[in-house]
UniProtKB/Swiss-Prot annotation:
Membrane topology value: Single-pass membrane protein
Protein name per the record: Photosystem II reaction center protein Psb30
Subcellular location: Plastid, Chloroplast thylakoid membrane
Species in which this protein is naturally found: Gracilaria tenuistipitata var. liui
Record HAMAP family: PSII_Psb30_Ycf12
GO-annotated cellular components: chloroplast thylakoid membrane; photosystem II
Length: 34
């Protein structure tokens, strides 16, 4: 049995962990350009 709820939570958590730092870097670079 595959627990899709757990997989969904892990996927969303991984997306937040991976996308979070990228967004911060992009914002800092844009502020640096301005």
């Amino acid at each position: 049995m595959i627990n899709w709820q757990v997989i969904g939570q892990l996927t969303s958590l991984a997306m937040i962990v991976l996308v979070g730092p990228a967004v911060i870097v992009v914002l800092s670079l844009r502020k640096g350009d301005l």
